[in-house]
Curated annotation (Swiss-Prot):
GO terms for biological process: argininosuccinate metabolic process; L-arginine biosynthetic process; urea cycle. One of its GO terms (molecular function) is argininosuccinate synthase activity. Keywords: Amino-acid biosynthesis, Arginine biosynthesis, ATP-binding, Cytoplasm, Ligase, Nucleotide-binding. This is Argininosuccinate synthase. L-citrulline binds at Y99, N135, R139, S192, T201, E203, E280. It catalyses: L-citrulline + L-aspartate + ATP = 2-(N(omega)-L-arginino)succinate + AMP + diphosphate + H(+). GO terms for cellular component: cytoplasm.
C-alpha cells in the first residue's frame, strides 16, 4: 500500500487538520468539489491568537466537511511541556537564550490525538497544511503512522493539480469568493506565526533576512520589551515545584496544569520573558531562522534549573544537560515517543526530576532580564556552612585539604612531561603556546 498519495483519492474519506485559515478552508472546499469526502479535525491547543474555537468546526461544515470535530489537546500539551522542562529537552540555545521546542511539542500532541480521532471515525487518510521544505511534514508523518499503521497521507500542497489551480493565497481567496463565501484575506504580515499554549513561532517572509530583527514582531504572548515607551514595572514572583512538578505560582496552588500554564504565561508575558532569536538546523539539515515566545515555559525552566543546581551533584547535572540536549533533538525531529527518547525521559524524570522540590523567588524586569532572590528546598545539598569563609567549625581541616591537593593532582608530573614531549616534537613553540609561559624552558630542555 502506498503511504503517500500524490493525487486526490476521489470518493474516499480524508481527514484534514483544519485550522479555519485560508489554506485549509480552500483545501477542504476544493477536495469536496473534486469528489473526496473530507472530515475536519481541529486541535484546541490553547492558541493565544484564537478567539472562538467553536466557530471553526461550524465553518468546516459550511465548506463541505462531512463531519467536523474539535479535539481538546490542552491537557496533553501541557503535560508534554512539563515533561520537557523536567528533562531539559531543549537543544537550540543562542547566547544563553533557549528555544523551548514549543512547536515540536505541539506537533507531537496534534499528530497523535487527531489521527486517533480520525481512526475512531474510520478515516485512514490524513492531510494537513505542512509544506515539503519544513519540519512539520516529517513530524506529522511519523506521529500519524505511529498512531495508525494503516494511515495514508494526502497533502494538497504536494498535489500538482491543487497547486496548478490554487497555488497561492490570492488564488485561494478568489476561489472561496467564486464559490459564494465572502472570504477576505487577512492583512498580510511581514512574517508568519504559529502558536499553541506553550509558545509562539514567528518565521518566514521578512524574518528570513537576518537584517530583520525582533523589532518587526508584534508579540502575541508578551510585550515589546525593547520599546522604551512600553512601561514594564519589576515584579517579584515565586515558583514552587514538588517532585519535579510545578504546583504553585505566587503562593497560589494549582490542581489544573492548564490553568497553571496560563498563569505562568501571564506572569512571564508581562515582561516579555522567554523571547529568543534562533538560527537552527531543520531536519533536512538546511538552516532556518525563527523568533520565539514562551513566557510560561521560560519562567518554569528558570526556577526548575535553579533548584536542580542546588539539589543534584555535578555529574548528575552534567548528565541532565547532555541527555536533555539529545532528547531535545529527538523531540525536534518528531521522535518524542521513540524508544531512545522514552529511555532518556524515564531516566531524567525518575532520577532527576523526582528530587526537585522547593520554591524559587525571582524578580522579573524587561525581557530576559531577571534576578534570583531566594531558593528554598529541604533537598538542597548546597550548605553555606560547608564552605564559609568565616572562622568557625568546619567539616574539614587545613590538613585535609593538603592531602586532597596531593592526591588529586598527582598527574601534574604527567602533564609536565606531556608538554615537554609536545615541545620536542615541534608541536609547541614560544610563538604558538599562548598561555604557556614556560614553553621556552621546555624548548631549551628539548634541545
Amino acid at each position: 500500500m502506498t503511504t503517500i498519495l500524490k493525487h486526490l483519492p476521489a470518493g474516499q474519506r480524508i481527514g484534514i487538520a483544519f485550522s479555519g485559515g485560508l489554506d485549509t478552508s480552500a483545501a477542504l472546499l476544493w477536495m469536496r468539489q473534486k469528489g473526496a469526502v473530507p472530515y475536519a479535525y481541529t486541535a484546541n491547543l490553547g492558541q493565544p491568537d484564537e478567539d472562538d474555537y467553536d466557530a471553526i468546526p461550524r465553518r468546516a461544515m459550511e465548506y463541505g466537511a462531512e463531519n467536523a470535530r474539535l479535539i481538546d489537546c490542552r491537557k496533553q500539551l501541557v503535560a508534554e511541556g512539563i515533561a520537557a522542562i523536567q528533562c531539559g529537552a531543549f537543544h537550540n540555545t543562542t547566547g544563553g537564550l533557549t528555544y523551548f521546542n514549543t512547536t515540536p511539542l505541539g506537533r507531537a500532541v496534534t499528530g497523535t490525538m487527531l489521527v486517533a480521532a480520525m481512526k475512531e471515525d474510520g478515516v485512514n487518510i490524513w492531510g494537513d497544511g505542512s509544506t515539503y521544505k519544513g519540519n512539520d511534514i516529517e513530524r506529522f508523518y511519523r506521529y500519524g503512522l505511529l498512531t495508525n499503521a494503516e494511515l495514508q497521507i494526502y497533502k494538497p500542497w504536494l498535489d500538482t493539480d491543487f497547486i496548478d489551480e490554487l497555488g497561492g493565497r490570492h488564488e485561494m481567496s478568489e476561489f472561496m469568493i467564486a464559490c459564494g463565501f465572502d472570504y477576505k484575506m487577512s492583512v498580510e504580515k511581514a512574517y508568519s506565526t504559529d502558536s499553541n499554549m506553550l509558545g509562539a513561532t514567528h518565521e518566514a517572509k521578512d524574518l528570513e533576512f537576518l537584517n530583520s530583527s525582533v523589532k518587526i514582531v508584534n508579540p502575541i504572548m508578551g510585550v515589546k520589551f525593547w520599546d522604551e515607551s512600553v512601561k514594564i514595572p519589576a515584579e517579584v514572583v515565586t515558583v514552587r515545584f514538588e517532585q519535579g512538578h510545578p504546583v504553585a505560582l505566587n503562593g497560589k496552588t494549582f490542581s489544573d496544569d492548564v490553568e497553571m500554564m496560563l498563569e505562568a504565561n501571564r506572569i512571564g508575558g508581562r515582561h516579555g520573558l522567554g523571547m529568543s532569536d534562533q538560527i537552527e538546523n531543520r531536519i533536512i539539515e538546511a538552516k532556518s531562522r525563527g523568533i520565539y515566545e514562551a513566557p510560561g515555559m521560560a519562567l518554569l525552566h528558570i526556577a526548575y534549573e535553579r533548584l536542580l543546581t542546588g539539589i543534584h551533584n555535578e555529574d548528575t547535572i552534567e548528565q541532565y544537560h547532555s541527555h536533555g540536549r539529545q532528547l531535545g533533538k529527538l523531540l525536534y525531529q518528531g521522535r518524542w515517543f521513540d524508544s531512545q527518547a522514552l529511555m532518556l525521559r524515564d531516566g531524567l524524570q525518575r532520577w532527576v526530576a523526582s528530587q526537585i522540590t522547593g520554591e524559587v523567588t525571582l524578580e522579573l524586569r524587561r525581557g530576559n532580564d531577571y534576578s534570583i532572590l531566594n531558593t528554598v528546598s529541604d533537598n538542597l545539598t548546597y550548605k553555606a556552612e560547608r564552605l564559609t569563609m568565616e572562622k568557625g567549625e568546619s567539616v574539614f581541616s587545613p590538613d585535609d585539604r593538603i592531602g586532597q591537593l596531593t592526591m588529586r593532582n598527582l598527574d601534574i608530573t604527567d602533564t609536565r612531561e606531556k608538554l615537554f614531549g609536545y615541545a620536542k616534537a615541534g608541536l609547541l613553540t614560544a610563538s604558538s603556546a599562548t598561555g604557556l609561559p614556560q614553553v621556552e624552558n621546555l624548548e631549551n630542555k628539548g634541545k
